[in-house]
């Protein structure tokens, strides 16, 4: 199996990796503090419906909690949206994040590629 997802900093000397959604500056001190303050929660299986998280995001963004979707990452959300929409035909920019193509192929969508040109600083 070919490893197609980005973030392989173990085999590739990468300074800034734009193929994954990670913070190039590392974890913030606020996140480290929140983890330390809630370490006892880490042994509890998380709420699959993300009720508290969705409510907190909804309150902060002033929207209804029903308008907030949570996932374990971009790839999971991409696959979920593609499964919900089930597009028969899709226009996909290339090059792009590999999970778009994988998700579309998983539902049998006919993919039409629009290739960006490097000479135009895609």
PLM segments and residue spans:
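Phosphate-binding glycine-rich loop
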Residues: 50-90
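Short glycine-rich anion-binding loops that position phosphate/pyrophosphate groups of nucleotides
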Residues: 21-24, 74-75, 97
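Hydrophobic residues at beta-strand termini and immediately following loops
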Residues: 18, 45, 71, 114
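PLP-dependent aminotransferase-like
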Residues: 83-122
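A general structural signal for well-ordered alpha-helical segments in protein cores
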Residues: 15, 28-32, 50-54, 78, ...
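Short gly/ser/thr-rich secondary-structure transition/capping motifs
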Residues: 1-4, 72-73, 117-122
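N-terminal "arm"/small-domain region of PLP-dependent enzymes with the aminotransferase-like
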Residues: 1-44
């Amino acid at each position: 199996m070919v490893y197609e997802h980005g973030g392989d900093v173990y085999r590739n000397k990468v300074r800034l990796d734009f193929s994954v959604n990670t913070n190039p500056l590392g974890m913030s001190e606020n996140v480290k503090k929140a983890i330390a303050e809630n370490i006892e929660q880490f042994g509890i299986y998380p709420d699959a419906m993300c009720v508290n998280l969705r409510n907190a995001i909804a309150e902060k963004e002033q929207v209804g909690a029903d308008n907030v979707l949570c996932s374990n990452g971009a790839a999971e959300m991409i696959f979920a949206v593609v499964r919900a929409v089930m597009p028969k035909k899709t226009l996909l920019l290339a090059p792009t994040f590999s999970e778009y193509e994988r998700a579309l192929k998983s539902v049998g969508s006919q993919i039409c590629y629009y290739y960006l040109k490097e000479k135009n600083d895609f």
